[in-house]
């Protein structure tokens, strides 16, 4: 037992030593985190995520959370007898569904995340893109193999982001938690894919990192091997041959756009792993797939 304790202590010391250069490097920087998947639904992972976010803040990194809520939205739609539909990875959202989306994201999911972070010593504040109208949206029309310009309801894309609200929260020492609902020119609500919001917000905040938490290890090739580094050219090839499809498309598109537009590192990581954020940011090997803005695949 004593030797196990010694090994454990040695491992902890090694981990801290490995983390120190990264803490120094990233202190004072912004990390935008897209929070979704199993990490949002499994109690142990939810608690671990909250602790990790608080730790990031304590070591000087400014985490900004953008959350999804697909399973929770689906559950509520099912309760009211509506079936969730998707086109090219985007949720079809009529007026009734939009009311439910906004209620679930802003009224339940956002508040739960805020409360969890605050329970572990953080100072999280929940906001929606309709607050101060800081996320302006326009209707998103989807192109499918069968038809171009398909209208899927109150689904939007980001037209512009005013980062003043989020920056103000960061300056006050708070952790912003953003529900991905935007506002149209007439004040109407738009459901925006959380990956798209996270990517655009990372660009506008000049974030050091964009981290997208998923239910997979990262981007995989057709044989199931993890691709640790990818360029836009390689991603185009993976889309063309059908390796990437469905719900991965908006995630990948957002990651690529962020990388091309100045976010220093964009990552797709496995949110099912305990301490996934810390493993990516504070270890030499990292985890998941890194999207590069250009050049050749490594």
Swiss-Prot record:
Q: GO BP, one example?
A: arginine biosynthetic process via ornithine
**May I have one GO cellular component term?**
cytoplasm
Q: Show which residues constitute the signal peptide.
A: none
Superkingdom in the source lineage: Bacteria
EC number annotated for this UniProt entry: 2.7.2.8
Q: Which HAMAP family match?
A: ArgB
UniProt keyword Lipid metabolism present: no
Q: Major place of localization? A: cytoplasm
Which residues are involved in binding substrate? 69-70, 91, 191
Q: Residues at site: Transition state stabilizer?
A: 34, 251
Xref: SUPFAM superfamilies: Carbamate kinase-like (SSF53633)
Where does this polypeptide localize?
A: Cytoplasm
What name goes with this protein?
A: Acetylglutamate kinase
Q: Under the GO molecular function aspect, what terms does this record hold?
A: acetylglutamate kinase activity; ATP binding
Tell me its family.
Answer: Belongs to the acetylglutamate kinase family. ArgB subfamily.
Which pathway does this chain act in?
Amino-acid biosynthesis; L-arginine biosynthesis; N(2)-acetyl-L-ornithine from L-glutamate: step 2/4
Purpose of the protein: Catalyzes the ATP-dependent phosphorylation of N-acetyl-L-glutamate.
Q: Which UniProt keywords apply?
A: Amino-acid biosynthesis, Arginine biosynthesis, ATP-binding, Cytoplasm, Kinase, Nucleotide-binding, Transferase
Reactions catalysed, as given in the entry: N-acetyl-L-glutamate + ATP = N-acetyl-L-glutamyl 5-phosphate + ADP
The cross-references to NCBIfam families, in alphabetical order and at most eight, read: argB
């Amino acid at each position: 037992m004593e030797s196990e304790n010694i090994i454990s202590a040695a491992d902890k010391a090694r981990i801290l030593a490995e983390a120190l250069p990264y803490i120094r490097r990233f202190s004072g920087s912004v990390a935008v985190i897209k929070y979704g998947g199993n990490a949002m639904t499994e109690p142990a992972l939810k608690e671990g995520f909250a602790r990790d976010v608080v730790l990031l803040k304590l070591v000087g990194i400014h985490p900004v959370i953008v959350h999804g809520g697909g399973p929770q939205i689906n559950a509520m739609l099912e309760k009211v007898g509506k079936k969730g539909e998707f086109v090219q990875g985007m949720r079809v959202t009529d007026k009734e569904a939009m009311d439910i989306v906004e209620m679930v994201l802003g009224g339940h999911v956002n508040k739960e995340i805020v409360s969890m972070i605050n329970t572990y010593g953080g100072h999280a504040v929940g906001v929606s893109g309709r607050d101060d109208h800081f996320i302006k949206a326009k209707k998103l029309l989807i192109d499918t193999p069968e038809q171009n310009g398909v209208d899927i309801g109150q689904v939007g894309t980001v037209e512009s982001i005013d980062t003043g609200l989020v920056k103000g929260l960061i300056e006050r020492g708070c952790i912003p938690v953003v529900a991905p609902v935007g506002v149209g020119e007439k004040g109407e609500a738009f459901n925006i894919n959380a990956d798209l919001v996270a990517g655009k917000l990372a660009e506008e905040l000049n974030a050091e990192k964009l981290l997208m938490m998923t239910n997979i290890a990262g981007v995989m090739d057709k044989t199931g091997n993890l691709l640790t580094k990818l360029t836009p050219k390689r991603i185009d090839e993976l889309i063309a041959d059908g390796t990437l499809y469905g719900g991965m498309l908006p995630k990948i598109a957002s990651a690529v756009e962020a990388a091309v537009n100045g976010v220093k590192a964009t990552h797709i990581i496995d949110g099912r792993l305990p301490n996934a954020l810390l493993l990516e940011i504070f270890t030499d090997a990292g985890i998941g797939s890194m999207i590069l803005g250009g050049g050749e695949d490594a």
